């Protein structure tokens, strides 16, 4: 179940839909997001604005999620995974690897993301599979 929650986040990301992100994320002032190379974002308004910016500047994005580890603590689910990414920005196709930590909190029987931290992988090796 916890891995399914993580997968829903990447489905929302892949769809480039802010409406889907609205449903995945908590909307409190204490949630946190750190995109690779960005400053710390705190609170849903700042985080939502970051997703709008990313989606407006991305033509398409595909993920192959590997090396997933999940820990469950009562009402918290912590996932760590490798995002194998193929994205199109403008006319350029970019492949990259991002190590991510995603934390979800169960509230009123629904799991919501409260933390996302992505870090670029040095010396990333592209997997030998198509991400499309």
Question: What is the meaning of each model-derived region?
Answer:
Residues 1-23, 30-132:
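A beta-strand edge to alpha-helix "cap/lid" segment located at domain peripheries
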């Amino acid at each position: 179940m916890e891995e399914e929650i993580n997968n829903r986040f990447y489905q929302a990301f892949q769809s480039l839909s802010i409406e889907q992100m609205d449903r995945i994320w908590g909307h409190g002032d204490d949630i946190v997001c750190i995109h690779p190379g960005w400053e710390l974002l705190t609170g849903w308004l700042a985080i939502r604005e970051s997703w709008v910016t990313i989606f407006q500047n991305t033509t398409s994005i595909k993920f192959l999620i590997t090396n997933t580890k999940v820990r469950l603590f009562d009402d918290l689910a912590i996932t760590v995974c490798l995002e194998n990414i193929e994205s199109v920005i403008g006319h350029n196709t970019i492949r990259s690897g991002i190590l991510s930590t995603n934390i979800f909190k169960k509230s009123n029987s629904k799991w919501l993301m409260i933390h996302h931290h992505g870090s670029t992988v040095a010396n990333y090796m592209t997997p030998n599979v198509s991400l499309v």
